[in-house]
Amino acid sequence: MPIKSRIRSIPDYPKKGIMFRDITTLIKDPVGFRLVIDSLTQRYLENGVDFDMIVGIEARGFIIGGALSYTLGKGFVPVRKPGKLPADVVSQEYELEYGSDKIEIHMDALEKGTRVLLVDDLLATGGTALAAAALVEKVGGVVAEMAFIVNLPDVGGEQKIRDKGYSIYSLTDFEGD
């Protein structure tokens, strides 16, 4: 069962001209969800990427990152929208495919030198992922790799992230469609 075939495409959401790739159809299917987590688990057990912690980006990055943390025996750190974390935070603004936003992480989330796998559901412009990477680095962490279910290479985020020197991995690409 290809992962791509389980992802719903919604035109003109959240605004006209955007083709939204909805992973809820993938993760509601227990076979599809297991395939995602098993595929990522296998990659990180076998590929030699060294990391200590998983950092997941709100909200869908929590779903994938939490399950992956469990299967790999790693801790999980959330990157959240403003006002959702109870202790002292560091913030980072960023641009989206369809606007701008801000995310936060606890100031004490990572110890200096902690290597992290940064996880989210989808890579489009790269703005959210780069903002999360900046947060990880602000609190002393090091991004070992970024992992996504879906990559939209035509939007340019993959190249932008690679140009900044980060390694990325995605399970499937939606190119030109």
Swiss-Prot record:
One of its GO terms (cellular component) is cytoplasm. GO terms for biological process: adenine salvage; AMP salvage; purine ribonucleoside salvage. CDD domains: PRTases_typeI. Pathway: Purine metabolism; AMP biosynthesis via salvage pathway; AMP from adenine: step 1/1. SUPFAM superfamilies: PRTase-like. Its EC number is 2.4.2.7. Pfam families: Pribosyltran. GO terms for molecular function: adenine binding; adenine phosphoribosyltransferase activity; AMP binding. Catalyzes a salvage reaction resulting in the formation of AMP, that is energically less costly than de novo synthesis. PANTHER family: ADENINE PHOSPHORIBOSYLTRANSFERASE. Homodimer. Belongs to the purine/pyrimidine phosphoribosyltransferase family. This is Adenine phosphoribosyltransferase. The gene is apt.
